[in-house]
């Protein structure tokens, strides 16, 4: 699908992030080491599943501070934070304090990408 539509974006929302590193590792392993599972299908572009992830997919999360810690494995450009407002489990009205806690020690550029710039790029608007 991503070979045919390289600009297509697919996301996983409200699923947090910690499952992604294992999933990417297993997808790449299966693609390389278990050809019986990929018989008849190979990437036209020679890309691994994890490379398609980096180019075409994203994850939105709310409370996954461990995911923030391993953001380089998941991909800083593939992560979007959301407060889940107005639902009752939302971080609002303490969203700023919550973000300050889970992004403590994270470079400002990474924090900005995850909390604003990545969503702006995905949906085609300019962040504040």
Sequence positions of predicted segments:
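Iron-sulfur cluster-binding electron-transfer modules in prokaryotic oxidoreductases
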Residues: 1, 84
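Histidine/acidic residue-rich metal-binding segments in metalloenzymes
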Residues: 2-51, 65-77
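Mid-to-C-terminal alpha-helical segments outside catalytic/metal-binding sites
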Residues: 8, 18-19, 42-43, 55-58, ...
């Amino acid at each position: 699908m991503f070979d045919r539509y390289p600009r297509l974006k697919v996301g996983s929302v409200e699923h947090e992030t910690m499952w992604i590193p294992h999933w990417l590792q297993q997808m790449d392993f299966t693609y390389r080491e278990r050809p019986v599972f990929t018989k008849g299908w190979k990437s036209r572009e020679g890309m691994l599943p994890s490379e398609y992830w980096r180019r075409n997919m994203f994850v939105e999360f709310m409370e996954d501070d461990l995911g923030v810690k391993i953001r380089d494995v998941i991909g800083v450009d593939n992560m979007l934070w959301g407060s889940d407002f107005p639902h009752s489990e939302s971080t609002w009205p303490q969203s700023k304090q919550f973000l300050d806690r889970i992004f403590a020690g994270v470079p400002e550029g990474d924090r900005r990408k995850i909390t604003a710039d990545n969503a702006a790029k995905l949906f085609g608007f300019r962040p504040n």
